[in-house]
Design a protein with these regions (language model features):
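Sec/Tat-exported extracytoplasmic proteins
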Residues: 41, 49-53, 62, 78-82, ...
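Extracytoplasmic/secreted envelope proteins and their assembly/folding machinery
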Residues: 42-46, 71-75, 79, 96-100, ...
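Bacterial N-terminal signal peptides
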Residues: 4-16
């Protein structure tokens, strides 16, 4: 129901977790990663790949991000290994860079489509305010354009990496997502909206336009 969906999305702004690392499990040829991104996840990712050389797909599930460097490095490792990525539920911040690492990138229908999105923003201080110096030093703009296979619009990326609050983001949903009174499925959130992302303003670009995904086929994770 729409009411339940809205409540769930609103709760994202208030979620906290004490999980020590991303939860990882391997099902067939798929590595499923969920939860917060923390320091040490790069090593754990490498260990999972070494122990399971047949992995071809990484599913990223319900992660609000976390450790900055891990998002970059794991995304780069995913691309280096030629793996595909799939978003299952929400994948925001550092998780979104891991997702962009996929050679092929898709949405899943593990959850309802209005609960499934990839969310991008900048880098932030501990108080939630934008850390412009870190955004510039790590080259976030160029990195996103590179890993979107050159498709991301630099002007829009520049806008989202300069969102002032870490509760803001640009959230990309699948074009087939059914949302009452909304034709566009990309949302620009400044971070002060009560209902994010569905209560945010919309943008007339799609995840496919921007190279967030490589096609619109919907995947299903092997544990669902």
């Amino acid at each position: 129901m729409l009411f339940r969906t809205v409540l769930w999305l609103a709760s994202l702004a208030f979620m906290h977790t004490t999980s020590p690392a991303m939860e990882a499990k391997v099902v067939n040829d798929t590595l499923i990663l969920s939860g917060p991104v923390v320091q040490g996840d790069i090593q754990r990712f490498n260990e999972a790949m070494a122990a399971n050389p047949g992995i071809g797909t990484v599913v990223l599930r319900n992660s609000l991000g976390g450790h900055v460097e891990s998002g970059y490095r794991i995304g780069e490792l995913i691309r280096k290994h030629g793996l595909s990525t799939v978003v299952s539920g929400h994948c925001v911040s550092s998780c979104s860079r891991m997702f962009l690492g996929g050679k092929e990138r898709r949405f899943s229908n593990d959850y309802s489509l209005e609960r499934t999105f990839v969310g991008f923003h900048g880098h932030y201080h501990a108080n939630g305010q934008l850390n412009r110096a870190l955004v510039e030093r790590l080259g976030l703009l160029k990195w996103i354009i590179k890993y979107s296979d050159g498709k991301a619009d630099p002007d829009l990326v520049q806008r989202w990496i300069n969102i002032e609050l870490n509760t803001g983001m640009v959230a990309f949903m699948h074009p087939q997502t059914r949302i009452f009174f909304r034709d566009e499925k990309t949302f620009f959130c400044v971070g002060r909206e009560q209902l994010r992302p569905l209560g945010c303003s919309t943008l007339a670009v799609t995840a496919l336009d921007m190279g967030v995904v490589t096609d619109l086929a919907l995947s299903r994770s092997p544990d669902q």
